Each structure stands twice: as structure tokens, then as C-alpha cells.
Amino acid sequence: MDSHNSAPPQIAEVRMDISSSTSVAAGNKVCRGAACDFSDSSNSSKDARERMASMRKLIIAVILCIIFMAVEVVGGIKANSLAILTDAAHLLSDVAAFAISLFSLWAAGWEATPQQSYGFFRIEILGALVSIQLIWLLAGILVYEAIVRLINESGEVQGSLMFAVSAFGLFVNIIMAVLLGHDHGHGHGHGHGHGHSHDHDHGGSDHDHHHHEDQEHGHVHHHEDGHGNSITVNLHHHPGTGHHHHDAEEPLLKSDAGCDSTQSGAKDAKKARRNINVHSAYLHVLGDSIQSIGVMIGGAIIWYKPEWKIIDLICTLIFSVIVLFTTIKMLRNILEVLMESTPREIDATSLENGLRDMDGVVAVHELHIWAITVGKVLLACHVTITQDADADQMLDKVIGYIKSEYNISHVTIQIERE
């Protein structure tokens, strides 16, 4: 609980059970409206707004793709241009990929279940993976068709129509790139620190699990919001075991005002983040734009010299390879999430050293940092403190450091005595 916050705890329900045979006391306090970003995603207004904004962009992109695809199919047939037809096929894969992304965003809002305690956020990762595989499959088909046409001479190509259709395609792709790329991937530092949802974190719901061990050897679960309001408390006392364990799970419920002003500075340092499905769609559009430019250049050359129709096939080969390379980074990010690697924007060594440099901290071990999906990072570790250190104060310092410096939304800390 913050020292500057004098607001009394607000407790909606208290249950206490005492067993004389086991000398164990258990109590539960549940805060009104407490919701976990991972366990109950449908109650997270921040994630809901993120999904809705992303879905609107993808729906507009699908409509534009369908319109332009129809234009390219007609224009490609009339111009006898494989490059235009393959671009139309690429747009078809875009439509399918966007549809997968839309489904992924919708499914990510499903309420968590006992089996899926973190919700369905990772469906977004799987949807983006399928989307990328569609690009690779189509690129392989296009390369094969281009090679066949190189071996077997194709008919005449109308360079003027090829140029006009690809120019129109470039215009449509620019519109979609602006739409999908302007996803507020930059961090904002609002002084009030309340949660915004433009695909960048502003301190929405944070979750902490705290574990203390001291000489009394009890077991405590404590939930507390950002204003000092108790969320959940379970107290178990085990005499004779010589072990005190404090476990706290703490969603920090931010209101629209009155949040800790010291957190606003940390918001300025947050890494850029955008929804992975919107970013995947952006890569699709980027590949289409590059291909449209190539087709425009090829069309202009063929328009000027019709006998150089082989350029149509060369464009198909070159830009199919470029499209493949545009997906490498996204695929790497997807695999890192699925492999539960430490996110690249977080320096685990620096974080660990920062904890060890704190007064009262003896050692840090069992440090694990991973992500459920892009932008939703989790951390768990054991922190050993000196005998004379106050466990609660040390816990607050550790949690505050991790949140302010690294913006990790779900933290589990176990405090141990040396």
C-alpha cells in the first residue's frame, strides 16, 4: 500500500473460517469489480478497446482488398499480365489472412476458463502464424508459375493497362498502410497515468503475486489495488512449522484520476507496441505496395518496349522473394512468444542486477520473464533478503522497480530470508 494514500480499504465481502483441530485461520476479502487481465479478459475495457480498434481497421482493409482484387483480376486478364494476376492472388490471401486476424481478435476476448486461466490471448499469435504461412504458400505458387512462363513463352502483355492497374493498386495500398500503420505504437506519458488502449500500455490492470517468508512462518494471500483497496486476503497460520509464507495477487485497479504521479514518467519510456494481427496485416499491405511499385515499373518498361515482356515475370520472382523477407521478423516474434523466450525489449540481466543492487537484497534467483502475447509480459522470481529487512517494504520496492522500469503487467515475487 502506498504511504501517501490514506483512503481506507473498501471490502465487499469477508469470510473467515477457523479450525481448532488444525489451528489454521483462513479469510477471504474480495474487492468489488476486481478483474484480472488474464483470467477475465472480457472485463478488461482496455483490451476490449484495443480489439475493437484493431477489428475496425481490419474490416476496412478487407473491404478495400476485395474492391481492388476485383479490379486487378479484370485488368490482369485484359493485360495478360501474370504480375497483376499474382498480385490479385496475393490480395486474396490478404483477405483470408485478415479474416483469420479478425477471428483471432474476436476469440481473444473470450472469458477465461479453469483450463485456460490466462484467457485466449495467444489465439492472436496463432492467427498471425497462419496468416504468414498463407503468404509463404502463395509466394511459392507465384514463383512456380513465373518459372513456367519463363520456360514457355507467354503471349503479349499490355504495358499501359498493366501500369494503370498497378498504379491504382499502389494508391489503395497506401491508404491501407496508413490505416494499419497508424496504430499508436508509440508510448504516451499522461500525468494522470490512467489506462488508455491505443495499442500501448498506460497502466491498465496489473497483477502481482507476492510471497514472503519470515520467522513466524504464516501463509498470506493479499490483493490490493492502486489506491490501497484490499482485493483478496487469505491467511493461513501453521504453528510449529517454522515457516511464514506471504502470497499476494494484486490487480492494481486504476481510476481515471488520482493515480500515483510517479508512474507517469515510466509511461514515457514504454516500448512501442501494436496488435500483432494488425502488424501482420500491415506486412501484407507492405508486400503488396512493394509489388505494385515493381509492377508499375515493369508495366512502364513494357509499355515503352513491348518486346521486353519478360520483365513481367522477373517482377513476379523478385517481389515474391521480397514479400517472404518482410515476414521474417514477425515470424521470429511469434516463435519467441510460443517458446516463452524473454521479450527482446526487456534486458533480463539488467533487471536482475537492478534488483540485487537494492538495499536489503541478498540474491535473486529463479527469474523467469515471458509473454502470453505481444505486449502482455509476465515475470516470476525469488528474492532473498537480509534478516533485518522488512519483507513488506522490500516487496513494495521490488514490485515498484519492476513496474516503473520495465512495465511488466503480471508479477510474481517470492520473498525469502537468507
Swiss-Prot record:
Kindly state one GO CC term assigned in the UniProt record. Answer: plant-type vacuole
Keyword Zinc, does the record have it? yes
**Where does the record place it?**
Vacuole membrane
Any Pfam family matching the protein:
Cation_efflux
Span list, region Required for zinc-binding? 182-246
Enumerate the transmembrane spans: 57-77, 90-110, 123-143, 161-181, 283-303, 308-328
The UniProt keyword set, sorted, is: Ion transport, Membrane, Transmembrane, Transmembrane helix, Transport, Vacuole, Zinc, Zinc transport
Which GO annotations describe the biological process of this protein? zinc ion transmembrane transport
Topological domains annotated Cytoplasmic: 1-56, 111-122, 182-282, 329-418
- InterPro entries per record: Cation_efflux, Cation_efflux_CTD_sf, Cation_efflux_TMD_sf, CDF/SLC30A
Q: Which residues lie on this side of the membrane: Vacuolar?
A: 78-89, 144-160, 304-307
Q: Does the keyword Transcription apply?
A: no
Q: Where is the composition biased (Basic and acidic residues)?
A: 196-227
Please give, as recorded in its UniProt entry, the membrane topology of this protein: Multi-pass membrane protein
* Superkingdom to which the source organism belongs: Eukaryota
Q: Which residues lie in coiled coils?
A: none
Q: Where is this region: Disordered?
A: 186-248
Compositionally biased, Basic residues: which spans? 235-245
The task this protein performs is described as:
Involved in sequestration of excess zinc in the cytoplasm into vacuoles to maintain zinc homeostasis.
Q: Which family does it belong to?
A: Belongs to the cation diffusion facilitator (CDF) transporter (TC 2.A.4) family. SLC30A subfamily.
- Mind telling me what this protein is named? Metal tolerance protein 1
* Name of encoding gene: MTP1
